[in-house]
Amino acid sequence: MTVRLHPTDAQTYWMSAKIPNDQFLLYCFDTDSPAESVREELLRRAEQISDLGMRIVDFPLSLRYPSLRRAPDTTDLVHIRETGRTWRDCLDTVAEAFTDQLDPHRSVWRLHLVGGVTGAPRCDGPALVAILQISHAFGDGRVASSLARRLFGDDRSAPAPIADRTRIGPREFFRRATRAYDLERQLAADTAAGTVPASAPGRPRIRVNVAPAGRTSVRCLVRDRSDFTAPGISVTVGAATAISLALERYLAHHGDPVPPELGAEATLGKHGERRARNHFGNAGVDLRPDITDLAARAHAISESLQARRRRAAHPAAEAQSLASEAVPAVLLHWGVRQFDATAVPDTVTGNTVLSSVARGAADLEVGGGPVRFTAGFPALSPIMGLTHGVHGIGDAVTVSVTSAASAMPDPDVYCSFLDRAIDEVSTALRRSCAR
């Protein structure tokens, strides 16, 4: 089977040469089953999932977009890491894995197994931790989560439907380009009229907006879903509110001013038909450190997030995506090669990254043990030394923190602020409901 990559996915693939972007999906299972026995179980499951038998093949000189083809062998893609480790050791293993990015020409995935993990949250005894590493070109967080569910025992999880690509001739290219231009003008008019929110402004850089260097640290806070929610407040917004408070206190701890424009670069699912494996965009969301009442802050953050979604839902966005599909592969690849990953902008879309994905019901099982929680770790980038993942399964929500020593030399200090902030936000939301 040969499937040509969508231009969006090809761009993600080519960009990985400049900014590593593999995804790492962690699932913790409450079982003392040996990793060796679980490995065979998972290999059998992987063989039944066609998407896990793929690799990326380049076309000479990028005259066409790369394609997905069958990989010759996947039997050595499940790696057993050292067993009998603590939960902190396991997180260090995750951070170490960031440095060993996939070769997608061989396979688009790899699985790391760590058995006998002691002290894992919500586990009664030793735990088995599985970390699915997957090429971002192969799918966004929702695609990757669907694959993980199938690998870990959910036979009902269906792959995300992706529309077939059609050949685009000169006439169709002209039609799409013209429509994109017309709708871009309409977006400008709608923005001026106030019917569509304006673009989010850039934000001043803070101490974490530096190139990642030194040790990479990973931390996870596993909490109940109810700690983040209230009427009108989603898990994403509740977590963003806690992050805003923790960042505010961390900056003050180091004697830095807290900019009123403090914000997060959030991932938002695109509207319309999924035409690519990566069907999302990024937008800057206000974190509103100027509002001291945490319930009111949460509602203000929710309004900012909804404003970004309303703008992204304008027909101009989808028209632009359709027009970009007609860009020749050689031209898009040339443009990616011109990208300067070392350039430092005056402002940033967000001061940290916030990626939030719901990974379904807690009905997965490996080695006879149920899943207790899941986590994810958005990649660091040249001006982003701190990222946050918010991932839920069942009633458990994990807020993960990935940081570089150059941006945050004291991650445990920050995580203590974040842990307390979640408690305070939860209390504030409950009190607001009782009024």
What are these regions (language model features)?
Residues 1-3, 26-47, 54-383, 391, ...:
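Soluble acyl-CoA-dependent acyltransferase catalytic core bearing the H(X)4D motif
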Residues 388:
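Hydrophobic/aromatic beta-strand elements that line small-molecule binding cavities or substrate pockets
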Residues 1-17:
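N-terminal alpha-helical "arm" segments
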Residues 19-23:
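TRNA-binding/sensing appendages of the translation machinery
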Residues 414:
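Acidic-enriched catalytic cores of C-N bond-cleaving enzymes acting on peptides and small amides
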